[in-house]
Each structure stands twice: as C-alpha cells, then as structure tokens.
From Swiss-Prot:
Its job: Multifunctional serine/threonine kinase that plays a role in several processes including egress of virus particles from the nucleus, modulation of the actin cytoskeleton and inhibition of apoptosis. Phosphorylates UL31 and UL34 homologs, two critical regulators of capsid budding from nucleus to endoplasmic reticulum, thereby facilitating virion egress. Modulates and redistributes host components of the nuclear envelope, including LMNA, emerin/EMD and the nuclear matrix protein MATR3. Phosphorylates envelope glycoprotein B (gB), probably to direct it to the cell surface.
Positions contributing to ATP binding: P110, G111, S112, E113, G114, Y115, I116, Y117, V118, K127
SMART domains the UniProt entry points to: S_TKc
Active-site annotation: D218 (proton acceptor)
Protein name per Swiss-Prot or TrEMBL: Serine/threonine-protein kinase US3 homolog
Disordered: region residues: 1-21, 46-88
GO molecular function: ATP binding; protein serine kinase activity; protein serine/threonine kinase activity
Gene3D superfamilies tied to this protein: Phosphorylase Kinase, domain 1 (3.30.200.20), Transferase(Phosphotransferase) domain 1 (1.10.510.10)
C-alpha cells in the first residue's frame, strides 16, 4: 500500500457518502474479498414488519414434475462444494425459482449476489410478507445460510427457509419496516433512549456471534433492520467469516465489507479480529447520535485516503498507533498522526457534537484506533451508557412516517 497522499485531500464532512460499487450498480459499496472470492450482499429497505416465522433446519430441494431438467440438486447441505461453476442469473431464472414456493409482491434493487424480492408464501392465508434473496450456484449464499442456521438471538435476523431450484438458491428472511439508515434519515438524530435501545441490541448481537467465532465484517446502518427501537436485528451476513480455530487472535481474513465503515486495521490489510466489528458499531452509534455528520468527506478514493481521513478527523495521536511498528498502519500511516490532543482523549469531532458524557465516552472507546485496546462488545455493554435504564417512551414506526 502506497503512503503517498492522493491528489485530492479528504476533509471531515457533514454529508454521508457510501462507496459506489461499479460492479453491482448499487448505491452502497461493497469491497470484494480478494483472498477467498467472497462478495458481500446488500439488503434494501424493508417497509413492513413480520411476526415470528418457523425456521427450518435444512435447505430444501424443490422438484417439479415437468422434466428432469426442472428438478433441483442437492446442496449438501447448504451450498455447492466449490467445484460447480455458477450459472449466470437472469431475472427470469430468479423469478422462476422464487415462484416455486412464493408469490412475488415486488422486487427490490438487486445486490451483488442476485435478486431480492418481497414475497408472500403460497397457501399462507395470513399474507405475511418475507424477503427472498435468489442467487445462482449458492457458493457464497451457502456460507451465509450455514452461519444463520446456527444463530438463535433476538437481535440477529432469522433464516426462515432456504431452498434450491435448479442452480438457484433462495434464502427467505423476515421483512422489517425499514433499515436503520432509513430510520435515521427520517427521524434522526435519534432521542437518547432510542439510541441506547438500538445500540444495546446491536452489541448483544455482536457479543453473541463473536462468542460463536464469527466476524460480521459489514456492520452499518444499512444492515440493521427494525420495526421499532426495541425490535432491531443485525442482518446481511454475506461478508461474515469464521475465526480460525475459534480464537480471537488477529489474523488476515481478507478484505471485505464497506470501505466507509471498515476499521483501520482492515483498511490497512493488517491482521484483525472481532474488534473490527466494534469499530463499525461505534460509527453506527455516532450516526444515530448526529444523523448525517460523518468522519468522512464527500468522496472516498481508496483505503489509503480513507485511513488518512480517519486519522485527520479523529486527530489520532502517534501513541495511539499499534505498538508493533511492522504493521501496515505504522509503516504507511503513522506519518500522518496528529499531536493536537493527549493520547486517548476524546476527539473534538465527538466532543463538540453536544452528546452526553456517557455517550461520547462509549463512542470514543469503540473508535479506539489500535484494536488491541478497543473493548469487546461485552465490555461496551458494561459501560454506564448501557447499564442505566433508558426512558420508557419508545417510538414506533408508523406508515405516516415512511
């Protein structure tokens, strides 16, 4: 990674700009994993809620009576073994697969892996809406299904059903009223009681998956879904990876997630661990508190530019860099450190935002530049911000606000 500054200087800004992914033509960007070929998936806004649905344990094979070509293939049990070359998905292929079991109500903008639909289950008189994601081959989706099948937490999106028809895998999940990005855009900055409730749910989800040896790697407001603040879930596990040997020692797991919300160590291609999710969750906490104000400028030209923007806007002190000078962060970016505040003091961009002391302290701890000193999700949940009970009044999303 080059340490030469880009021609254009990034400035701290008040407008949020997600990185554009030209490969998928979606609004919010994805960084593709160059090591294992895994792509992340973007969900879209879910404008309605769904009640609890039964979770099936396996991926079903859907067979038809028309011809042998229409019969499904075994997923063994969640995805192909990597030897099959995924076919190219067309909208017709995806629609045909979805309609084997669901009625399509509407379609959402496609993500990097395939197509996303709002559906109702055939024969379900309740007309409960769900989200069906359809992708050919099932290689990447199979990993996401495998992870979600083992999750059971109130703040993690549930896998309702998964099945395969021909070469298309369909993954069914509950449909929520909106994502957190949309909720903040409509309501934000949020009241403190809502901020605490939502972030507590997110941290609970992260503590749960980290205990199970999973790193999410793409925690952001667009991947958090809710009906109301006390009913929030973390979704989109398309970028998630499993820890090697179930240890949280930093390792090189590849570059994945969203450039704007990645941790410094991930941006620098240094070894990382579950603490990378804590950094991203800290940005979520900040975004809920201040709405559109971010640490980043109006354009992001790459990981180097992003890191320099973080260092500048957070006024990262040289002593806050990793003690290991062989890391990419030290070798290429320590030269941009700023001695405008004491080491580990709360950055001015947080302090001047008018937050409560408990809130700004929690954000500052989560945005600790060196992952070695960044607290875990369980540690954050023990801070005064989350151990104090918030006010009882909680806002419920209604159609009038959507």
């Amino acid at each position: 990674m080059s340490s030469t500054p880009e021609a254009e200087t990034m400035e701290c800004g008040i407008s949020s700009s997600k990185v554009h992914d030209s490969k998928t033509n979606t609004t919010y960007g994805i960084i593709h994993n160059s090591i294992n070929g895994t792509d992340t998936t973007l969900f879209d806004t879910f404008p309605d809620s769904t009640d609890n649905a039964e979770v099936t344990g396996d991926v079903d094979d859907v067979k038809t009576e028309s011809s042998p070509e229409s019969q499904s293939e075994d997923l063994s049990p969640f995805g192909n073994d990597g030897n099959e070359s995924p076919e190219t998905v067309t909208d017709i292929d995806a629609v045909s697969a979805v309609r084997m079991q669901y009625n399509i109500v509407s379609s959402l903008p496609p993500g990097s892996e395939g197509y996303i639909y709002v559906c109702t289950k055939r024969g379900d008189n309740t007309k409960r809406k769900v989200i069906v994601k359809a992708v050919t081959g099932g290689k990447t989706l199979g990993s996401e299904i495998d992870i979600l099948k083992k999750m059971s937490h109130r703040s993690i999106i549930r896998l309702v059903h998964a099945y395969r028809w021909k070469s298309t895998v369909c993954m069914v999940m509950p449909k929520y009223k909106c994502d957190l990005f949309t909720y903040i855009d409509i309501m934000g900055p949020l009241p403190l009681n809502q901020i605490i409730t939502i972030e507590r749910g997110l941290l609970g989800a992260l503590a749960y998956i980290h205990e199970k040896g999973i790193i999410h790697r793409d925690v952001k407001t667009e991947n958090i879904f809710l009906d109301k603040p006390e009913n929030v879930v973390l979704g989109d596990f398309g970028a998630a990876c499993k820890l090697d040997e179930h240890t949280d020692k930093p390792k090189c797991y590849g570059w994945s997630g969203t450039l704007e919300t990645n941790s410094p160590e991930l941006l620098a291609l240094d070894p990382y661990c579950t603490k990378t999710d804590i950094w991203s969750a800290g940005l979520v906490l900040f975004e809920m508190s201040v709405k559109n104000i971010t640490f980043f400028g109006k354009q992001v030209n790459g990981s180097g530019s992003q890191l320099r923007s973080i260092i500048r806007c957070l006024q990262v002190h040289p002593l806050e860099f990793p003690q290991n000078n062989s890391t990419n962060l030290c070798k290429h970016f320590k030269q941009y450190a700023i001695q405008l505040r004491h080491p580990y003091a709360i950055p001015q961009i947080i302090r001047k935002s008018g937050m409560t002391m408990d809130l700004e302290y929690a954000i500052a701890k989560m945005l600790t530049f060196d992952q070695e000193f960044r607290p875990s999700a369980q540690d954050i949940l023990m801070l005064p911000l989350f151990t104090k009970e918030p006010a009882d009044a909680l806002y419920t999303i209604t159609a009038a606000h959507m």
